[in-house]
Amino acid sequence: MSRIQKTFAALAAQQKKGLIPFITAGDPAPALTVDLMHALVAGGADVIELGVPFSDPMADGPVIQRASERALAQGVSLTQVLAWVTEFRKTNATTPVVLMGYANPIERMGEETFAKAASAAGVDGVLVVDYPPEECESFAALMRANQMDPIFLLAPTSTDDRIAAVAKVASGYLYYVSLTGVTGSATLDLESVAARLPLIKQHANLPVGVGFGIRDAQTARAIGSVADAVVIGSRLVQLLEDAPREKAVDSLRAFIADIRQALDA
């Protein structure tokens, strides 16, 4: 059982919903990344999604684009991100870490080299936004061969064929994007999410995390009523952009603790 699978099995046994926060590695300051990861866990995160900065993050809205730009301007690379995961693992051997990003940095490093390095660092899952599942069998197999779960996105526009293709290669959990568009945009339509998830479950026997459009404890709780887990990203990245640097860690922990409390209520 992978760390991600163990986490979701424990949540199911406790009848709890998963909380999966996203932050961009290196933002707002490289020196804070590992402390922010620990703050997420202290606040009640079950899985951490760590964004790998990239110069052309086409699926992301302006908030996460700016975070990527800030991190890249400070020299953050994929190698550096893996070093932070290694550092995090020195004092946390249980919380799964999923790298989320784009194909280009992985391909520059080389898929085999990346797979070995990420696994050695203690990465548990990899979500590559611009890898289509239909063309991803060898990459997914490489991840699994290195004890990592390949994680994929599904959207309201995903056809049955696309869902079936994802189900064939995915493990760990599925990330359902509850809105069409870029991260941080639009508002949430709970009814359409509730209607869609059973259709996904018909194809894939995996937990489903729902993200995009979750901004506060209230929306998180609403999504938690229908999904296995709640993914929250743009709102956290915005919080880190707005918070004074010296208060970033405490602000993040407090915000996540509020979400956790709402999910458990």
From Swiss-Prot:
Positions of the catalytic residues: E49 (proton acceptor), D60 (proton acceptor)
E.C. number(s) listed in UniProt: 4.2.1.20
Single GO MF annotation: tryptophan synthase activity
Keyword Flavoprotein in annotation: no
Pathway: Amino-acid biosynthesis; L-tryptophan biosynthesis; L-tryptophan from chorismate: step 5/5
Record has Lyase as a keyword: yes
One Gene Ontology CC term in the entry: cytosol
PROSITE patterns noted in UniProt: TRP_SYNTHASE_ALPHA
Transmembrane segments: none
Role according to the record: The alpha subunit is responsible for the aldol cleavage of indoleglycerol phosphate to indole and glyceraldehyde 3-phosphate.
Alphabetized HAMAP family for the sequence: Trp_synth_alpha
Record-stated family: Belongs to the TrpA family.
Protein name: Tryptophan synthase alpha chain
